[in-house]
Amino acid sequence: MDDSEEDQRLPHHREPKEFIPLDKLSELGILSWRLNADDWENDEKLKKIREARGYSYMDICDVCPEKLPNYEAKIKNFFEEHLRTDEEIRYCLEGSGYFDVRDENDQWIRVAVKKGGMIVLPAGMYHRFTLDTDNYIKAMRLFVGEPVWTPYNRPHDHLPARKEYVEKIINRGGNQAVEAR
């Protein structure tokens, strides 16, 4: 991703364009799946993922100026670099956006999330989110147990979740047991 201060909703490709393979995201601890967003209520693959990973809570949110109260403030908060002490799981049912994640060299990688894409960011990973220029995403948020909404804005390197992430992923070059599709 480039270092431009232009509109955060733009793709921000480096020149020349550089695309990151799913294997690289997997090495950073990121999981991803392509699912059927048009029939998510009956999707057996989604049910299996939720059961296997213990995602017992879910809700759906629309992020757009017309539907999200305090839209501008929330978009600004989403784009503030932060980590969470639990996984961040998002399933795009409609629309699109970008998750920006830090690699092992502390450089940004921009991950496009589109309809049908499910992404899991590991606890302790610094990241941020923005919509793209379409200004709309309908996302399913999943949690293990009761939802924890607390973002810890950078720097919070002292938190156990961050220390574990750095030790497991950054210092060891990735989690080879991670499955990304």
Curated annotation (Swiss-Prot):
GO term, biological process aspect, one: L-methionine salvage from methylthioadenosine
GO molecular function, one term: acireductone dioxygenase [iron(II)-requiring] activity
Name of protein: Probable inactive acireductone dioxygenase 2
Similarity field: Belongs to the acireductone dioxygenase (ARD) family.
HAMAP family membership: Salvage_MtnD_euk
The UniProt record lists the keyword Nucleus: yes
InterPro entries from the UniProt entry: ARD, ARD_euk, RmlC-like_jellyroll, RmlC_Cupin_sf
Name of a matching Pfam family: ARD
Function: Probable inactive acireductone dioxygenase.
GO cellular component, one term: nucleus
Keywords associated with the record: Cytoplasm, Nucleus
